[in-house]
Regions:
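Substrate-gating cap/lid alpha-helix
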Residues: 121-154, 174-177
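Short glycine-enriched, charge-decorated loop/helix-capping segments at active-site entrances
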Residues: 18-23, 88-91, 126-130, 166-167
Length: 255
């Protein structure tokens, strides 16, 4: 039973795009913490994840703080932002990941690792599928090597539908985060595997015209700003600080 859960990573673990009723973002890590808090007294949760962070900064900045905070459970998901960059260096990225995970495990901290899913049916990321496949494969290997809990989304097709994704087509929707949390809880051994087959009514597929309209809106609202930041060497996380930098209690949110 864990009493001090710390989340590390980028926008996925920060919770984009799952709005919290009280403001900011909730996300799968908050949802996981909310559930764990009901199973033990004096449960505490912190979250150091910041959107846009690449592997180097996650490991160099977040891991040392994590070690000082002395959690008994850490979740980490990282590497996608590296895979999206032109200067993708897979060997260096994985070596850095292994270093960070080994530091946590050396302190006997339980680690939950997320291996990202197959973007084959998600057109916006299909172009980097080979990179993400490599990242997934190596992440799974690290989880086994260091005896970590693992959520492996690669073989799961349940998240292919648009309903699980936000308008930016990169981050999960609130529903997507809900099922990601269920996957995490299953990996931790405190929930069943029903997340693999979401039994929810799916909306009808949009018409061709609606899809083209959404494509244009996505291009203007998300793709262009993202490209501009890349050209300018900026990150969406510049100037931001962690949303929960210290351990504190967390209460379940009524969905």
């Amino acid at each position: 039973v864990w009493k001090r859960y710390l989340a590390l990573g980028d926008s996925f673990s920060e919770g984009l795009s799952d709005p919290h009723p009280a403001g900011g973002y909730r996300g799968w890590t908050d949802r996981t913490a909310e559930s764990l808090s009901t199973k033990v007294n004096d449960f505490r949760y912190a979250n150091l994840a910041i959107r846009g962070r690449k592997m180097n900064r996650i490991i160099d900045e977040q891991i040392p703080i994590a070690l000082e905070m002395k959690p008994d459970l850490v979740s980490i998901a990282a590497g996608v932002n590296d895979a999206l960059r032109r200067n993708w260096d897979p060997i260096t990225v994985i070596a850095k990941y292994e270093y960070g995970i080994s530091q946590l495990r050396r302190e006997d901290i339980d680690v939950l690792i997320v291996a990202f899913g197959d973007p084959e049916n998600r057109g916006q990321l299909a172009g980097v599928r080979e990179r993400l496949q490599f990242l997934n494969h190596e992440t799974v290997k690290l989880a086994k090597k260091y005896d970590c809990r693992l959520v492996d989304f690669w073989p799961e097709r349940g998240f292919d539908h648009d309903i699980f994704w936000s308008d930016d087509r990169l981050h999960l929707s609130s529903l997507g985060h809900e099922f990601a949390a269920k996957a995490a809880l299953h990996a931790l051994g405190v929930a069943d595997d029903s997340w693999r087959n979401p039994n929810i009514p799916l909306p009808p597929d949009p018409t061709w015209v609606a899809r083209r309209f959404n494509d244009v809106k996505w291009l203007n609202n998300h793709m262009v700003p993202w490209a501009v930041r890349r050209i300018q060497g900026r990150s969406s996380g510049d100037g931001l600080t962690p949303k929960r930098p210290e351990f504190s209690t967390i209460s379940p949110v009524n969905n």
